[in-house]
Amino acid sequence: MTLKLYDTMAREKRDFVPADPGRVTMYVCGPTVYNHAHIGNFRPVVVFDVLFRLLRHVYGEDAVVYARNVTDVDDKINAKATAEGVEIKVITDRYLAAYHEDAAALLTLPPSLEPKATEHMGPIIEMIGELVANGSAYAAEGHVLFDTQAFPDYGQLSGRDLDDMIAGARVEVAPYKRHPADFVLWKPSKENEPEWDSPWGAGRPGWHIECSAMIDKTLGQTIDIHGGGIDLAFPHHENELAQSRCAHGAPVLANYWLHNGFLDMAGEKMSKSLGNVIIPHELLKTTPGEAIRWALLSGHYRQPLDWTPELIEQSKKALDRLYGALRRAKTVEAGESEPSDEVMAALSDDLNTPLAVSGFFELSSAIERAVTAGDELAITANKGRLLASAGLLGFLQADPDSWFEGDADDDLKAKVEDLLARRIAARTAKDWTAADAIRAEIDALGVVVMDGPAGATWRMKD
């Protein structure tokens, strides 16, 4: 089955053919660690986690190298540290740890590599030096800037033209720039800002050059896949591409450019500046990470996704249905299986996750029918296929009872099980008054009882 991916550069789906099937490389822009990441920041984390899982399934776990950087040099980080009166590393360590915690709660695999900007100053300065030496960059008033006019293909990725950029400019252009679109590779640091020595004076790098240098150092001059949110296509990815190609003379930086769409809130782009953000670090206190993950994958990754309370409720209900089928079949072991052809076909068509998850319900229905019929062979086969298919998207890896019981502690679990046993005894004795009273007692504990052919099960209320 051929994997097709939509390449932003080509403006079309293309068959994915890695340069080396034994070392498939992918780079995705990671967090700037100055605060908790919002749910929109986590959409690419989850989307490219699915691609990472798919590539590992196709080419082998050891054959895929996924790098996701950490930006730990930034004005916002400096401002946060100053406001709190602490060292910059206190801020970056705190929010990187929180980012890792949230990413794990959303069931994402850690990347193969996680390069930090502060740990790559040598390669960053070296790459800037190469650009200056070959005429692609110039020094001016303590800054080093990339000369966009020296790169004829500038604007190719985003479909922009240099002349249009001048006409559409709304900000004052620094007088030391040769062209308004020229961007900073190195800049002098202000007082109390971090700085590193360089041939152009003490200072720090611009954002774009950090990624170019880290890609080069961790993955190589040309990589298979570069991913990120669509908001990064310009200027960040456009500038990365220009820097890397000019530094090495390579014809391409990435053979495939993938971008996910925005996450909206009531039709508006979600962003910290608009104050309409959802923070997973807080949301996870009340909502299972798997439900958040389901919501993020409920639409095609290239399309905008509108985040609503209803979306989360729908995601919980979808997982309830799937875990419910697995719970009813829990006495039968799952068979060894590959993902279903339908799920593989959906994911191979530019990561069509909505179509892929629809295939889960066909398998769960088959499990339900097999349970009703007492067909253990069919249960084994379909259960194995469902778990393998869902695992490819990072779903259904929890114990079904754990999913329904949520954060219930051992004391509560024991109390509910005792009440259920007493309720069964009352129903067996046809003491309906006692049975109803026990059910009301269970309800008061925040527990929902679900009666089924295999007996009563329970779950915590939402």
From Swiss-Prot:
Give the matching Gene3D superfamilies.
Cysteine-tRNA ligase, C-terminal anti-codon recognition domain, HUPs
Which cofactors does it use? Zn(2+)
Motif ('KMSKS' region) positions are 269-273
The record's Gene Ontology cellular component field reads:
cytosol
Bound cofactor: record note? Binds 1 zinc ion per subunit.
SMART domains assigned to the protein according to its UniProt record, in alphabetical order:
DALR_2
Where the protein is mainly located, per its record? cytoplasm
Q: Name any Gene Ontology BP term.
A: cysteinyl-tRNA aminoacylation
Q: What NCBIfam families would the database entry show?
A: cysS
Query: What is annotated about its quaternary structure and interactions?
Result: Monomer.
Q: Mind telling me what this protein is named?
A: Cysteine--tRNA ligase
* Organism of derivation: Caulobacter sp. (strain K31)
Q: Which gene encodes it?
A: cysS
